[in-house]
Amino acid sequence: MRTKINIKVVVGVFSFLLPLSFLFSSCSEQMDYKEYSIYDAAYMQKKFERAGGLLSTIYADLDSDFGNYDGATLSSATDEAVYSHDGNAIESFFNGAWSPANANSSLWTTCYHGIAYCNLFLDEFTGLTFDDYVLDKNYMAEMYQYNNYQWEARFLRAYYYFLLVRQYGGVPLITSNMSADDASRQPRATADEVFAFIDSECEAIKDQITKDYGDLGDLAMSPANNGRANNLAVLALRARAALYHASPLFNANNDKNLWQKAAELNKAVLDSCSARKMKLSTDYKGLFIGNTNWSDSKATGEIIFGRRMPTENRNFETYNFPVGMTGAGAGGGGGNCPTYNLVSAYEDGDSRKEQTIACNGDSWPNANTVPLETYYGGVNGLPNAYATPTGYYLKKYVTESVQIAGNGANTCKHVWVTFRLGEFYLNYAEALFNLSGDGYTAPTGYAASAKPSYYINQIRKRAGLKDMETGLSAADFKAAYEKERFVELAFEGHRFFDVRRWKEADKYFTNIQGIDIKKTADGQFTETPKTVQTRQWNDKMYLFPIPQSEILKSGGALTQNPGW
């Protein structure tokens, strides 16, 4: 018989103790937070919703980036964007202020918070029978859902460890409940060990977790469990983690076995998507608009897994609407402004450009039909406060139809796309190229059709582009691939970490450009590239510093990352 649980489990790992009450919620589309006290398994199995609530609490720690740095996103610490408000916290990444004492991220605490809840659930709350409900008509469906929670918890724990390892390298591997004192003294596992844990967990649960919540027959719950991790999310996590493990940051000796594994696992995602009849969306912009990607099949048909924000709001729109708008569009903050580095990467005719970036002369549909004036002296340009310093405004993830000011102000849904099919075409192409060394030839032992260029071209076709140029040298093909990934995944949280895992930040992240737009007397415009920011780079920044507070709490068990 289980006894009352010692509630002093670690949640921030070393930062704070779990309180006597948890915020629990049901697993419906909107997080419905309720407060419960947890004492033991007997209490937990009094109601199914208590177990479901604990899982929802774990899901609530999933990452997103709708302006995590006072409106700025990580894109504004890359060559994707410049944040239009001087002095924003995002500048610490490149102005010399970044340090263990100013660690620039709460992810360490957030991830270990989620991991602690996963360990709590797995150690204490599996194997319950909910005997009081045996005669209920929904008992079998409720039990099916409950029994699936353990696989979801293991997926979420593995996902949190992926977030940690890509940011810090090796971290403490805590896989069971322990006291805060014990947890604070755990040494770092190596990055290889963390990647191995992620891989083994995904292997163990991939055939256990639900494959499709929409195809459960009599076991289906109402409302449908949209947004929960399924078999495909597990495959996607495993494949992405393998790609990172094979990359130069974590694979200094270029071990081809790691690239082989990355290729196999990313191909498995493509094959699984094909078996489910998933295709690249015909609505690229809709992939990132919450009122669309929440449920619209044209968009959701490409999305593998996403983080649904619990409440509707207009915060991201307020951060990123152009300044100088009137009426429904008034009140925008300029925000994360795309760079000329990004804009110049788009080829002529690339449909992704107009769905990602607003340029001088474009219209902003909800506000008015007057073209945007991002030129110097224009309504939406400098020297107006917070106007774009680059000449461009952001469209991607921005719901342009939202009214952010006045009596008609409204809100919208937001879904952060964690995994989508398009990424895995690119991942597979990258792994194949690193095996073959040639962009147009399949690696030894692969089918002749397994050419890196083929999978890149699938992405280009959706954008309305011709196949990529043939006959490129290995170096030029690599550059073309990196450019394709740059534009396809812009503002999705990849660039910050892609350039780091390639160890190419000194190439991409130092000279940040915009355009200087001038209106001539005859109403024409001149556009001249200009340097907007010259950013500092030091190779120690390939990994984050571990927060100094955590180092001190460890009593010497935790070692700091090199250079910090």
Predicted regions, residues:
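Conserved, well-structured interaction surfaces
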Residues: 49-52, 56, 60-64, 86-168, ...
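Bacterial N-terminal signal peptides that target proteins for export
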Residues: 2-14
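Long, intrinsically disordered, low-complexity segments
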Residues: 27-28, 59, 111-114, 197-199, ...
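Acidic, serine/threonine/proline-rich low-complexity intrinsically disordered regions
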Residues: 171, 175-178, 185-188, 236, ...
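C-terminal substrate/ligand-recognition segments
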Residues: 105, 359-455
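Bacterial N-terminal signal peptides
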Residues: 12-23
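An aromatic- and glycine-enriched ligand-binding surface/loop that stacks and positions planar moieties
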Residues: 28-91, 169-171, 195, 199, ...
